């Protein structure tokens, strides 16, 4: 397991590229402080790691929406025995004990709400998923949220389905 701040990914790029991704080394990379982290200042915003890591071969990139999903993604990452990056934001999370962890199929996204009745679909990942869903529910909006928990690979099946729905799609 390798833990690294998102903002320092650029400094570790060669090692991640050549020694982990291309060699298909079974390393799980925990990317801390992903996203905007105001408390650490503008030099520590974790916004470039996706652009840096996405082109690398053999590397899965995920960002869970909450601690529960993080446990299952971490469990999956260790079971798959291949290069796997898990992004997570600065701060704490609400822990919920589980009896058993579940494998999550790589590249799958989840739909929160009803795609058929929604007039708008919001695609998001990470902790923003629940924040957006809470606002939608509080205001009773005809909007559905897609939890795009895998940044690489994308859920091509769901993406193709969304294009056929003839609805407004917002990628957040």
Residue ranges and their predicted role:
Residues 1-118, 130:
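Conserved thiamine diphosphate
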Residues 119-133:
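Extended amphipathic alpha-helical segments enriched in small hydrophobics
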Residues 120-121, 168-170:
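Structural motif
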Residues 89-91, 125-127, 148-149:
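Histidine- and/or cysteine-centered catalytic micro-motif in compact active-site loops
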Residues 87, 171-172:
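Conserved active-site loop/cleft motifs that coordinate metal ions or position small ligands
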Residues 3, 30, 123-125, 172:
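Short hydrophobic segments within beta-strands
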Residues 114, 129-168:
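Generic long, charged, amphipathic alpha-helical segments
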